[in-house]
Amino acid sequence: MTREPFLRMENIVKAFPGVVANDHIDLTVERGEIHGLLGENGAGKSTLMKILYGLYSQDDGEISLSGTRLRLDSPQDAIDAGIGMVHQHFMLIPRLTVAENVVLGEREPATPFRPDADAGGWLPDAVRSNSLVQSLAGRFSLGLDVPERRIQELADRYGFDIDVSAKVWELGVGQQQRVEILKALYRDVDLLILDEPTAVLTPTEADLLFDSLERLTDEGVSIIFITHKLEEVEAVVDRVTVLRDGENVGTVSTSDVSRADLAEMMVGREVLFTVDRERVAPGEPVLRARNVSATDDRGIEALSNVDLTVRRGEVVGIAGVSGNGQKELAEVIAGLRTVSAGELTVDGRDLTNASPRTFIDNGVSFVPEDRNRYGSAGDLSVMHNAAMKDFREDRFGSGVTLDYGELRAHAEALVEAFDVRGVHDVTDATAGDLSGGNLQKLILAREISRDPDLLVANQPTRGVDVGAIESIREAILDQRTEGTGVVLLSEDLDEIIDLSDRILVVYEGEVVYETTPEDADRERIGLEMTGGGDATATAGAQVRGLGGSS
């Protein structure tokens, strides 16, 4: 007799206008199994998981857990059934603290008023112990101590450098991703859905997470692990299901297939895992930053006396652990953040603390780390997003009128050239309709189409599939060949080494180390990224000169 799978999804169908996202998909997950879910962006993975989490209702098909058929009309239904989910796109409230976001929606018991408690200590004993007062405390969080201690312990346990009392808006993308992971770890679940959970984690942090997942599965928790990183599939996944164009291509044991096999299942063709970086002689400097210092959104110094020179036809890779000043450096170079000291020139023109528009007009293009928040307008059409920085150009109209025919043709050309999928009509499809990888390709297409002198790319391949990664990396190297200076910020060390001509390591807002791909030592770079290099102080003193003169 065949044992009933812990989770069974049968013949799941979900269609949106113009596209069938899930076409009769079957998925089974065993108890205590880490089950991988692979597929290109737009293959239907997120849609399938949103159905399982009650965010979407399937058009057809059935879902059962432990043999019991489920009706999931809302996330609360899923939570009540013991299903938790970490979303790829953040679902946080910026004005709340980390701890408040983690416990949001939890039915926390009220903390009784105590004579020695800060909250309610001034009330008489009869009032503090009154059942009605305690009930109101539970309903309205009166006197409720937010369980920050447990959340902080979780954060420390998994190596998350995060203050759980900080407001979410004060955090960078990497730290916000960790809050999402904490939200899932905080709850006891039978089935945990992880949608790209390690996208912004360091290898060490990812290893800690993997250890925790294995402990969870030892306790009988089942995990669906959505990832684009094939090495993660090999490391932690027991079986993997591959989706392509909304259909189930197959389910295989990871021990029976190679990375190349999985990649070919995902995209339907052989995928190249290395890039051909042809030799290009760097030209004149296009960017010079001298003794640049800047503060973060909280007014705390994030950059300290950074020197950086980028030449035409050169890719300068910036490596570092999230939260060490990379975000602020990218925004300074793109004109989105003012400097507190130092100067910045582009093609010899002083742009220190100039407006973002001035940077754009002087040939600076920018791919931000958060494509949804800073790189696009989700409610606007693909057409509008494709020309977002260029409405002033004569080809798109004159005065207060716009040539929508030209705008449409421009967007369609970019969609075709960069293989942006899921767009049947650029005037109807919105940026918010696109999957992460396709939105990233649209943003990169927009920035490159401006023929920039300097391209600043911050985490350009974060959270995208192997096929999209291949095309994005090729596009960056094409810009290098055409004489564009490129600043590449990435937490993917292999990407930095493969694409860069020079590599700088940033730690606590300073450039502490410089090397080349030919001389790169991954262990040394990793140590420098965490401040553990034996010669960090010496290297820092030397490199502050090297970064500006190489």
UniProtKB/Swiss-Prot annotation:
What job does this protein perform? Part of an ABC transporter complex involved in glucose import. Responsible for energy coupling to the transport system.
Top-rank lineage group of the source organism: Archaea
Please state which protein family the record places this protein in. Answer: Belongs to the ABC transporter superfamily.
Q: What is its EC number?
A: 7.5.2.-
Record membrane topology: Peripheral membrane protein
Q: Would you tell me the Gene Ontology cellular component terms?
A: plasma membrane
Q: Which InterPro entries match?
A: AAA+_ATPase, ABC_carbohydrate_import_ATPase, ABC_transporter-like_ATP-bd, ABC_transporter-like_CS, P-loop_NTPase
Q: Where is this region: Disordered?
A: 529-550
Q: Which SMART domains match?
A: AAA (SM00382)
Protein name stated in the entry: Glucose import ATP-binding protein TsgD13
Q: According to its UniProt record, where is this protein located? A: Cell membrane
Instruction: Name the Pfam families for this protein.
Output: ABC_tran
> Catalytic activity annotated for this protein?
D-glucose(out) + ATP + H2O = D-glucose(in) + ADP + phosphate + H(+)
Instruction: Give the signal peptide range.
Output: none
Citing just one GO molecular function, the answer is: ATP hydrolysis activity
PROSITE patterns assigned to the protein according to its UniProt record, in alphabetical order:
ABC_TRANSPORTER_1, ABC_TRANSPORTER_2
**Keyword tags:** ATP-binding, Cell membrane, Membrane, Nucleotide-binding, Plasmid, Repeat, Sugar transport, Translocase, Transport
> Subunit info?
The complex is composed of two ATP-binding proteins (TsgD13), two transmembrane proteins (TsgB13 and TsgC13) and a solute-binding protein (TsgA13).
